[in-house]
Every structure is written in structure tokens, then in C-alpha cells.
């Protein structure tokens, strides 16, 4: 049994698998575990007896302050050193200026895509930030980063005197008739329009590539963005392939 961890800025996903094909997963707020013992206290009731079967731990983390917690947790409770996802040449070539700057979650996504779906495609991951990644002939060619939905609505709320904090959901109208509708239209639909523009431009240059959609916020706009593949486990699959796959 393998324990796979995707440490994000807002939430962290913990998943167990035996074969890299079927996954059980749980989502925790990243801020709830500040020590290895706190992490154990949250995970033990969820994993139960499966904790005794863990023989390897793989981690993709974009929150450096949590890495020590994960390391100590792995050593104390499993006597295992975790394997950390990072950009390195192997099944994927990293054709960017500084591969070390590519987030571990994006590395995992790209590895999973190449292993499971092919060597050419566009990956959209919608979380705290929204990322776009391009893979051509098994080579990572770069991408784009946009603010995520909740980052945008909280920024408007904190950065202004009167704008409210609104629910994040799609707008089914052309223009908003009140402040809440204006924000929803700008944040959610505006993000979709931006992604459509980026995807469209990529396809103009690289051809009609398939799009895979993933990430905790992707369900909000799943029906608004044209895509060929929806895989909410893409990042976790990538952690498995990177750390324990062939």
C-alpha cells in the first residue's frame, strides 16, 4: 500500500492505493496540521488499519513550510523517507528555463498525463491558482498561471471597502444586475473566457490538442470549458507514477 500526498496552498489530498489504478482519498485543510502528531491524529481515523500496510510515501508539495511536517510524520510513524516529486528528465523532458521552478503539482500532472493519456495535450488544473500546462511529444513546453476563483473573490473583498464576499458559481447571464452578479460574472465566467483564449492560442500554434481538466475547483466550470478528459485524480496519479511507477 502506498500513501500519496498532494500538499496544496489551501487543501492537501491524502490518498492510498495498492496498484496506482484505484484510489481512496481524503482532503484536509493544509493549515490544520502544523506538527507530525497533528497530522497523524487527523489521518489515523481516516486510514484505520491501512496505515499498517503503508510501504512507501510519495509527496508533491507546493508549501515548503509543510515539508518538514511530512518528513517527520513519515519517519516517526512509518520509518520511511518520503519521495518528493520534482522536475527531472525521464518520461518527460522539461523544455523550460528553470525546471526546478515548476511546481510539484504541475510536475505530477504532466507525468500522469504522459503515462495515462499520451504525449500531446493541454492540462488545466483549477485550485488556489489555475494553471495551464502544455505537453508536446512528451516534452513539457511551459504554461500559464492565473488566480483561482477563491483568490479572486477574496482579493476583491479584502482590497475594497464595499465589495462583498460572494459565492463562487457560474453566471448564466450576459451582464450582472447587482454587485454579486457582477463579481460572479467577472470572476467565474471571466476566468473561463481567459482560459478559452489561452487554449485557443495554444491550439493555433500547436494544433488541436486534447484538453484534460482537473483540480478541486474544476467541477464549478466543468460544463463551461470544452475538454476531452476530466480526471480529478490526475495529480495523485502523477505522484504514484513519479514515485513508484515503472
Swiss-Prot record:
Q: Where in the cell is it found?
A: Cytoplasm
Please provide the record's keywords in A-Z order.
Answer: ATP-binding, Coenzyme A biosynthesis, Cytoplasm, Kinase, Metal-binding, Nucleotide-binding, Potassium, Transferase
User: Function, please?
Assistant: Catalyzes the phosphorylation of pantothenate (Pan), the first step in CoA biosynthesis.
Q: Which residues does UniProt mark as catalytic? A: 105
Annotated Gene Ontology cellular component terms: cytoplasm
Annotated source species: Thermotoga maritima (strain ATCC 43589 / DSM 3109 / JCM 10099 / NBRC 100826 / MSB8)
Q: What is its main location?
A: cytoplasm
Report the cofactors: NH4(+); K(+)
Read off the NCBIfam families from this record. baf, PRK13318.1-6
Judging by the UniProt lineage, the source's domain of life is: Bacteria
EC number from the UniProt entry: 2.7.1.33
Q: One biological-process term from Gene Ontology? A: coenzyme A biosynthetic process
A molecular function (GO) term: pantothenate kinase activity
What does the record give as the reaction this protein catalyses? Answer: (R)-pantothenate + ATP = (R)-4'-phosphopantothenate + ADP + H(+)
| Description of how the protein assembles with itself and partners | Homodimer.
Binding-site residues for substrate, renumbered to this chain: 103-106, 179
InterPro entries documented for this protein: ATPase_NBD (IPR043129), Type_III_PanK (IPR004619)
**Name listed for the protein in its UniProt record:** Type III pantothenate kinase
Please share the entry's free-text remark on the cofactor.
A monovalent cation. Ammonium or potassium.
Q: Where does ATP bind?
A: 6-13, 128
Which residues of the sequence carry a binding annotation for K(+)?
Answer: 125
Which family is it part of? Answer: Belongs to the type III pantothenate kinase family.
Protein's pathway: Cofactor biosynthesis; coenzyme A biosynthesis; CoA from (R)-pantothenate: step 1/5
Amino acid at each position: 500500500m502506498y500513501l500519496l500526498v498532494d500538499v496544496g496552498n489551501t487543501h492537501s489530498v491524502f490518498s492510498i492505493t495498492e496498484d496506482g489504478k484505484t484510489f481512496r482519498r481524503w482532503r484536509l485543510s493544509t493549515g490544520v496540521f502544523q506538527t507530525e502528531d497533528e497530522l497523524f491524529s487527523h489521518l489515523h481515523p481516516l486510514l484505520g488499519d491501512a496505515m499498517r500496510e503503508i510501504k512507501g510515501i510519495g509527496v508533491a508539495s507546493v508549501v515548503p513550510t509543510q515539508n518538514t511536517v511530512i518528513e517527520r510524520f513519515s519517519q516517526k510513524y512509518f520509518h520511511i523517507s518520503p519521495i518528493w516529486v520534482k522536475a527531472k528528465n525521464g518520461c518527460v523532458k522539461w523544455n523550460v528555463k528553470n525546471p526546478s521552478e515548476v511546481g510539484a503539482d504541475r510536475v505530477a500532472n504532466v507525468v500522469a498525463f504522459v503515462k495515462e493519456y499520451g504525449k500531446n495535450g493541454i492540462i488545466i488544473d483549477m485550485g488556489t491558482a489555475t494553471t495551464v500546462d502544455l505537453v508536446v511529444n512528451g516534452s513539457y513546453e511551459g504554461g500559464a498561471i492565473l488566480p483561482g476563483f477563491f483568490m479572486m473573490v477574496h482579493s476583491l473583498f479584502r482590497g475594497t471597502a464595499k465589495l462583498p464576499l460572494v459565492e463562487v458559481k457560474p453566471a448564466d447571464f450576459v451582464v450582472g444586475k447587482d454587485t454579486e452578479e457582477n463579481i460572479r460574472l467577472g470572476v467565474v465566467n471571466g476566468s473561463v473566457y481567459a482560459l478559452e483564449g489561452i487554449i485557443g492560442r495554444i491550439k493555433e500554434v500547436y494544433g488541436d490538442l486534447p484538453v484534460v481538466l482537473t483540480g478541486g475547483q474544476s467541477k464549478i466550470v466543468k460544463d463551461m470549458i470544452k475538454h476531452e478528459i476530466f480526471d480529478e485524480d490526475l495529480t495523485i496519479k502523477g505522484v504514484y507514477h513519479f514515485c513508484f511507477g515503472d
